[in-house]
Amino acid sequence: LPALLQELKILPASQLLVFSKTSMQRDRISPRTPRALYFDDDVYVGYCHAGEVIELAVSDPQLGAVFYTLDQTNRETPVIERQTHTCLQCHGATQSDGVPGLLVRSLFVAPNGLPILSEGSYRVDHTTPIKDRWGGWYVTGSHGSQKHLGNFVVRDRSAPRPWGNDVDRNVSDLSDRLSTDNYLAPGSDIVALMVFEHQTHVHNLLTKANYAAQQAMYYQANMNRALGQPVDSPLDSTMR
């Protein structure tokens, strides 16, 4: 992992920790062994302690989010493999606006890391109220009296609703919750989380706009051919 991040020029300080079982290596994820995410402007890297693969998502200007895995068990000749169906089951459907995209969710989580889907979830971007963010994520850093769902595990499912997080705020040390030595950084910074949520949403918007433009240009060219017009003649329907 350190060698890969160094090659990609991604800083370990970008580390985020998510403990909900909501990724392809869900059997490796729990509040004691969260999945780590690292990112820069265009690349996202997912790492599970003792996982079989490192997960990568790249924001491609033409295709949108493109997904890869790097086999961690083959240290002599590591190979990065393109992934399609496995990742696009979640990252290419309605939850990413119908285009290959990135998905950030906030939900209630049981002590073993399983999401409690019967209680619903929030799809998170920069417009989501702070009080609804970070369910299933660790959050470190100071934020005053503002409430959020980070660092919170539902231990009593019979507790009165709505469930709230009244104690796990302004956390600076995660060493009592997980073995921080297994990760490249000790925390899951609140500022990095907010940048991540904004950036993934913008990447999805850019992908959606690009797909719409490509579809419009394809429609325009075919309509012009049918009308005997130059293929690049603008149509009102593609200029809206």
Could you tell me what each predicted segment is?
Residues 46-240:
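Sequence context surrounding c-type heme c attachment/ligation sites in exported
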Residues 1-50:
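N-terminal alpha-helical interaction blocks
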